[in-house]
């Protein structure tokens, strides 16, 4: 006797399971068809630990990026023999057996360049090509040229690249945009996901998932052909983020997936390893030792997962904003990540429709709708009036307002009335003379006050514009651009982050000195310049007087000016 046909709601409930089971095979296949390179801390074992603990280099990333001159097993064997001999010199041993990363030549821009000219001149300076790498290099080869952030960041970074690509597109370099999308697709095919950066020690984690948005950007130039071409890789990346969901029970978490008590599926940041990060080895060990009440492996995992978030580090992840060892990234459901997952599902639906698979498109729409409901239910703080992260330990939405709260607006997942409240909260609590504060907390960490970061400025600007909040959007763009221009006028460079409590000052805090270059700042600056100035009269520098925003959707006109605040 046949079972009765399930009702429509039951059918819809089965859809996600079907997708997850089908695509889980994709991620497994990707992992099985490639040999995952081992990171230097595994290849070199005790030698790596000893070199990093000896602090031979001011930046721990230096030795993580060093290339062994011969088989690491042979180097390690030699080290074991020599290390206890009289007069052994560890620095000399390293210099003989490794090729250290070269410091890039300091770029000196031509005199008299405008801000736009400076950025356009930087694209070739920041472009790298690594089709082939040394056998034991931590650098992962990529088939096409790519643009790096700059400074100590000698490799391509995942979420940085999206904002860099916005600038490349604005400059008309669609060939470079296409190359970078192809590189990320290559990584998905080879490793099952896009790593934090193209280094072996970054393979255990990803970063905020912007690949689908990169494909959507490329589609602005190539049309639906880009969506069709990269649909398989977008599906594989989605499978990576949802890996483990098919066996998850209510109230459980598995890797990057969280299933709440009512069955709502959301995501969190996660790193597959629970050891010190090779690029910050000594710092991580010190952080773990400073809190003997927690297992070191737990702290290492949360440090790594914070790096996966892109916000390394921030009071956002900590119980005590002044103590990094209280961070617990893996027990927090981030509002920005889930907004990006919603956007990924929407783009997957669009791409599925482009290839004529309407059934699959409807399935992704169902997943996106379910996630949107989850965002509205769990990631909105009704008492405070803003979006926030959800705490898996307290089973409550957190109270802290951060710039991540603008992501639901950026991806058009926010309710209209809530977007209005977000505009008020942003202007009241985060807007500063030099742009948007990352948080309102001063912790000494780089993803806290008083630092402002280019990608968050753009997310906020675009998100607020999506909901007609143009005055606040203009405030953010103008304040940040003024900061960038003043810094450029004084130092002739763009930097990684800015102090937004004033204008004309680079940001501070964190594990390393301020870096210049800088990929995502360049990209966002170009987008904002073209936002505030009409296309028929583009500006090469930030105008001396502030354009007035309009209540309409028209571009902000340069001629309608008021005195600069």
From Swiss-Prot:
Residue ranges of coiled coil: none
Pfam families in alphabetical order: Trehalase (PF01204)
Known catalytic reactions: alpha,alpha-trehalose + H2O = alpha-D-glucose + beta-D-glucose
Catalytic residue positions: 312, 496
GO cellular component: periplasmic space
Role summary: Provides the cells with the ability to utilize trehalose at high osmolarity by splitting it into glucose molecules that can subsequently be taken up by the phosphotransferase-mediated uptake system.
Family named by the database record: Belongs to the glycosyl hydrolase 37 family.
Name this polypeptide is given: Periplasmic trehalase
